[in-house]
Amino acid sequence: HESGAVKAVVDKLLELGACYKAEDGAIMYRSAQYAAKYGTVNKKKTDDGTEEEAKDEVLVRANGIPTYFAADIAYHYNKLATRGFAKAIDVWGADHHGHVARMKGAMDAIGLHGEDLDVVLMQMVNLMRDGQPVRMSKRTGNAITLTDLLEEVPIDSARFLFNMHDAGSGIDFDLDQAVKTDN
């Protein structure tokens, strides 16, 4: 944000017509227009089970603060257009599957190629101790980082246990087993 890269990308998208200013001053990305070729775009289920149509997405809030989506577009623009990488490979949590089409569409909108983005969707890792799930919550500050994990589990054991699973399948990572595996 401090470098001005996010603002520059938003300005470019406005200039190209991929975004517009809403009445409240927010800058909106025409998500459905650009992302449809990559799949379903941010449709949401209503209370009665039907799906709402895709809506335009906020890039810059009415208060002037950019969303993380705007920063993501700027990151990919920097990587592919400015630094000249041929491909970007992102690893996202599976809960972000609905964002793949809009990101690829945004890349097309700004003059890149959405096909140059590969997204690996990872399922969640459940940590287990004594056969019970380790309860975690980012909101309460009760989380175990990878650094924390590697203080308890040898790195080779962690690598082996993570790599024996496909990215698309959930992992029950047994801390007790990981320590035993190393011995």
Label the predicted regions.
Residues H1-F69, Y75-H76:
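Active-site neighborhoods of enzyme catalytic cores
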Residues H76, T82-N183:
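Catalytic adenosine-cofactor/nucleotide-binding cores of aminoacyl-tRNA synthetases and other
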